[in-house]
Amino acid sequence: MIGVIGVKRNVDIAIREKLALYPKKHKKYVGELLNSFKEVVILNTCNRTEIYFNCTEEISEDEIFDKIFNVFNWNDDLKKYMFLSKEKRAVTHLMEVICGFHSRILGEDQILGQIKGAYKTAISDNSISSELQKMFEIAIACGKKFKTECKMFEVPVSSVSISINSALLKGCRKFMVLGYGEIGKLAIKHLLSHKVECIYLIVRDKSKASDLEGEIVEVLDFNEKNQVINEIDCIVSCTAAPHTVVRNEDIKTEGETIHIYDLAVPRDVDKELSEKERVILKDIDEISKIDDKNKKIRKERMEEYKHIVEESIDEFLNWLKIREVSSKIRNIKIRENEICSERIKTFSNKGNGENAKLAERMIKSTADAYVNRAIELLKSEALKGSDSYCAEIIEKIFLT
């Protein structure tokens, strides 16, 4: 059984923080999950916590919740904020997620790269090998096709772009970006495409961003951030830290207005800062509510190309159906080769060498013609969901 358990949409950020996973514990999580499930993929982003699994045994929903909650040491009171989807619903969920239909900012395509990353990590961890691997391969192809054909780059959107565009409209020109992961890199790229006065990039390891040093960008470590934090107009924070990185005491009470966009989950910024008159603080939930002119265009365009999602769902479900009869097909081919070998051997003992070779080709081609037709019929019936009776007849003909 294929399934996914994750945080429900529109759950408050205060709850999502309690369900966030820490990357440093990833190996431990996977190892423990594989004690209960055949395959596992963990999708852990700033806005999404989902565990995709495949189990061979029949297992109740309560058992699934218990096993996963025990691994992550989540409080049972948080179960009401989680969803569980199985079989086709789980497949549909992944295909829609990778195309941006479930993103807090509709159409945001960062999720495609994040799912590709989760898939590659699962391959590296040896935590997928069959059904989940195929499902993610089809999903990634679906996401790429959707992105290309839908041409969402013509109406670009992300939490980063919305935050920075909002700040620029408010007159911000001096920026600080905390963190240089995927989101931080997007923030820097977006800022460099606009006329800003300066950018302070705050990182743990300055060597990882040394190529950015220039007239506009100055790279500092976290110990140096407070030297300039009260001089800037806007902070974009997007670290993976499990703790607060911008504290209430870091920003003075008096001074010019400072806009803070906290894109992290758990939150990077002390929420008490919003009580200071000079601070305008927005977390990821508030950022996703900022209306932008492209929202309606994105929604209409995505609906127009939703057939790509539906085709990918069908592709995977059809693969599963064919896979269910693959062992029967394999046995038929084995039996075909056995019968052909017996007939060829019998003829070879009676005929001359030249005739034997001709007979071998004729026997093999005749057998292939009938066996391949039977296999085509079995596959066709499997796709219709009516393969059991067909398989019974074919087995009686070829395997008894």
Curated annotation (Swiss-Prot):
The record marks H93 as: Important for activity. It is an enzyme of class 1 (oxidoreductase). Keywords: NADP, Oxidoreductase, Porphyrin biosynthesis. InterPro entries: 4pyrrol_synth_GluRdtase, 4pyrrol_synth_GluRdtase_dimer, 4pyrrol_synth_GluRdtase_N, GluRdtase_CS, GluRdtase_N_sf, NAD(P)-bd_dom_sf, Shikm_DH/Glu-tRNA_Rdtase. NADP(+) binds at G179, Y180, G181, E182, I183, G184. Pathway: Porphyrin-containing compound metabolism; protoporphyrin-IX biosynthesis; 5-aminolevulinate from L-glutamyl-tRNA(Glu): step 1/2. Possesses an unusual extended V-shaped dimeric structure with each monomer consisting of three distinct domains arranged along a curved 'spinal' alpha-helix. The N-terminal catalytic domain specifically recognizes the glutamate moiety of the substrate. The second domain is the NADPH-binding domain, and the third C-terminal domain is responsible for dimerization. Catalyzes the NADPH-dependent reduction of glutamyl-tRNA(Glu) to glutamate 1-semialdehyde (GSA). During catalysis, the active site Cys acts as a nucleophile attacking the alpha-carbonyl group of tRNA-bound glutamate with the formation of a thioester intermediate between enzyme and glutamate, and the concomitant release of tRNA(Glu). The thioester intermediate is finally reduced by direct hydride transfer from NADPH, to form the product GSA. This is Glutamyl-tRNA reductase. It comes from Clostridium perfringens (strain ATCC 13124 / DSM 756 / JCM 1290 / NCIMB 6125 / NCTC 8237 / Type A). The gene is hemA.
